[in-house]
From Swiss-Prot:
Gene3D superfamilies xref list: QueA-like
Alphabetically ordered keywords of this record: Cytoplasm, Queuosine biosynthesis, S-adenosyl-L-methionine, Transferase
Complex formation: Monomer.
Family annotation (PANTHER family): S-ADENOSYLMETHIONINE:TRNA RIBOSYLTRANSFERASE-ISOMERASE (PTHR30307:SF0)
Record-given protein name: S-adenosylmethionine:tRNA ribosyltransferase-isomerase
GO terms, molecular function: S-adenosylmethionine:tRNA ribosyltransferase-isomerase activity
EC number: 2.4.99.17
Gene name for this UniProt entry: queA
Pathway it works in: tRNA modification; tRNA-queuosine biosynthesis
Keyword hit for S-adenosyl-L-methionine: yes
Organism listed in the record: Clostridium botulinum (strain Okra / Type B1)
InterPro entries hit by this protein: QueA, QueA_dom1, QueA_dom2, QueA_sf
Length: 341
């Protein structure tokens, strides 16, 4: 299967540049994965498609304001840092621009000097291993100095950092938001629970690999970047009980979906677990635990488009995407949603 098989025409004006003012009023395309039938709704209508036996699995990761603008200690030259992955307490794998100024031993200053950094090693694909020096709590300093690491296709500034966080975000560590979850409000989640639907939370810290293009022609040759995940005993029990009682396990977002499929055994059972996953789901993959998926509209030729094609069938997905373009749905991180049922 070739990468070009997952291409589609997307006019640039359909790439959403701002989050919706009211999260749950984005549009919702409902796709029946068996018949390919499509319905057009508003996100809050998701309630009508959930039944008391169902379980929604949500990723409670929180996006770090991981983009830092600083200067080189010796020269004062402007530098941009993007924190990718925590290696140990104050050591991060980081993308640094311009890279040529970030050799081992180079030192940098951020803000008024309350945060300093030194390159202590080279990482994968041109990244740098950076050690940070500061007094106080790193997350608080990052909150003051850092900016949200918005995807490259969002050109406009984000006025409110919280609009790029889900209302249930808790565990800090992501370089990007699990965007399907951005559509939920606290009120909508409450209504969902009142209907008898269980909410179960897991964590997957989204890495920047999520925006990296597939650079091989044959999709089977593509290698995913690994991302940290964890699921506790309580969540595992809710999911296993749902399956046993004939309910659906509905993943909110591709990150929840990939975590569930990483942890599930052949029989679709899950357990308390943490680790790193580089699972790559594409057509031909047989889902073990996920029955349905709430997700946004993904980039042409992306691994996430391949993941949804594995769940609903490539023809159904490509047809739904062409309909979404025709009906002017908003695409990508701040865009509209799709429910694959």
């Amino acid at each position: 299967m070739k990468v070009k098989d997952f291409d589609f025409y997307l006019p640039e004006e359909l790439i959403a540049q701002h989050p919706m003012e009211k999260r749950d009023e984005a549009r919702l395309l409902v796709l029946d994965k068996e018949t390919g039938e499509i319905e057009h709704k508003i996100f809050k209508d998701i309630l009508d498609y959930l039944t008391p036996n169902d379980c929604l699995v949500l990723n409670n990761t929180r996006v770090l304001p991981a983009r830092l603008i600083g200067s080189k200690e010796e020269t004062g030259g402007k530098m941009e840092f993007l924190l990718l992955k925590r290696k140990e307490k104050d050591v991060w794998e980081t993308l640094v621009k311009p890279g040529k100024r970030a050799q081992i031993g180079a030192r940098f200053i951020f803000g008024n000097g309350e945060l300093k950094a030194e390159v202590i090693g080279m990482g994968e694909e041109g990244s740098r291993i950076v050690k940070f020096y500061y007094e106080g709590i790193f997350e608080e300093i990052l909150d003051q100095l850092g900016q949200m690491p918005l995807p490259p296709y969002i050109k406009e500034k984000l006025d409110d950092k919280e609009m790029y966080q889900t209302v249930y975000s808790k565990e800090e560590g992501s370089a990007a938001a699990p965007t399907a979850g951005l559509h939920f409000t606290e009120e909508l989640l409450k209504k969902i629970e009142e209907k008898g639907v269980k909410l179960a939370f897991l964590t997957l810290h989204v890495g920047l690999g999520t925006f990296r293009p597939v650079k091989v022609e044959d999709i089977q040759e593509h290698v995913m970047h690994s991302e940290y995940y964890k699921m506790d005993k309580k969540t595992a029990e809710i999911i296993n009980d749902t399956k046993e009682n004939g309910g659906r396990v509905i993943a909110v977002g591709t990150t929840s979906c990939r975590t569930l499929e990483t942890i599930a055994d052949i029989e679709g059972k899950v357990g308390e677990q943490s680790g790193w996953t580089d699972i790559f789901i594409y057509p031909g993959y047989k889902y073990k635990v996920v029955d349905a998926l709430i997700t946004n509209f993904h980039l042409p030729q992306s691994t996430l488009l391949m993941l949804v094609s594995a769940l609903a069938g490539k023809d159904n997905i490509m047809n739904a995407y062409n309909v979404a373009v025709e009906k002017e749905y908003r695409f990508f991180s701040f865009g509209d949603a799709m429910f694959i049922k």
